[in-house]
A protein has these predicted regions:
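Amphipathic alpha-helical "stem/stalk" segments
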Residues: 1-117
Length: 117
């Protein structure tokens, strides 16, 4: 079973193991969205499960950049996906601010706009 199948099965035990698997999926989504990586699986199902676990497990800069991608490309996503990622960005802002120095000026502007709406 590969990491995508494990993630979708949601049967990984232990917080650290789940967090590690989540970060692998964040890397995968980052590559799909930012590097146009071709895939042979249902991206919608993977993205949906990623959103479900984002508030609990998301911490990396790639998770944050995936959030920014959704916000910048809102026309490509369902409305509730956009609301979910913005909500996670706001509710867990202290976690995401740990990456502030790594942000591009555009990403910092997106973060500012979302946190001040």
């Amino acid at each position: 079973m590969n990491h995508i199948e494990k993630f979708l099965a949601n049967d990984t035990k232990g917080f650290e193991a789940r967090k590690e698997l989540f970060e692998k999926i964040s890397d995968e989504l980052y590559a799909i969205f930012y590097e146009n990586k071709k895939v042979d699986f249902d991206i919608d199902l993977l993205f949906e499960e990623w959103i479900n676990q984002l508030g609990f497990l998301g911490q990396s800069i790639k998770s944050l950049r995936t959030i920014f991608y959704v916000i910048e490309n809102e026309d490509k996503f369902l409305d509730y996906h956009l609301k979910a990622v913005k909500g996670t960005l706001i509710v867990h802002s202290e976690r995401w601010l740990n990456h502030f120095e790594e942000l591009t000026p555009n990403e910092a502007l997106i973060l500012h706009k979302v946190l001040n709406t």
